[in-house]
């Protein structure tokens, strides 16, 4: 529940339609049928008409709409359009979010550049963790980490050295750094 992370915001105390995924990603799933009658009846569905839901963004920080990168102040509700292929997702300002390529299975494009998306507004840190992905060798120390640090006052991202190793590890990891803004693309 949101109140665990935003106890000072009384609007989150009884809010049970949203949740945080990790410390940075606010998810507001569509819980009621919007494109069907909800009873399984065979009805004509008009996918061209966008529906919307109200999403509360907790106070104490700013938020970015994941799909548009629009920056929004917290402490208020916003109406978010919910076409059939969009779930309302918001990212807390001061977050670093890794985004991998679209794949059909986990190791399909393991050497593709990894997008590191910066959501400015506060200083941020993030540790990228990688391992073999298909066994328990990480319990024996077979994994690697790379630390990222965003300094918001200077708009500087520092990327640390890789620590550790594992079988099949890429010799060279390529990053595409993206500063979230309405000009930098969406989702």
Regions found by a protein language model. Name each.
Residues 1-156, 165-186:
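Catalytic core of carbohydrate-active enzymes
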């Amino acid at each position: 529940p949101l109140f665990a992370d935003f106890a000072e915001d009384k609007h989150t105390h009884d809010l049970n339609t949203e949740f945080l995924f990790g410390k940075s990603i606010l998810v507001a799933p569509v819980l009621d049928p919007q494109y069907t009658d909800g009873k399984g009846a065979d009805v004509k569905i008009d996918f061209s008409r966008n529906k919307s839901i109200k999403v509360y963004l907790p106070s104490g920080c700013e938020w970015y709409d994941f799909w548009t990168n629009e920056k929004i102040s917290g402490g208020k509700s916003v109406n978010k359009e919910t076409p059939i292929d969009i779930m309302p997702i918001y990212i807390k300002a001061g977050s670093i979010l890794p985004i991998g390529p679209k794949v059909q299975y986990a190791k399909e494009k393991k050497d593709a550049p990894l997008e590191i998306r910066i959501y400015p507004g506060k200083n941020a840190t993030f540790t990228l963790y990688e391992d073999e992905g298909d066994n328990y060798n990480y319990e024996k120390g077979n994994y690697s980490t790379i630390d990222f640090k965003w300094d918001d006052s200077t708009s500087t991202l520092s990327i640390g050295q890789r620590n550790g190793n594992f079988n099949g590890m890429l010799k060279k990891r390529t990053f595409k750094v993206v500063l979230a803004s309405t000009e930098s693309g969406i989702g």
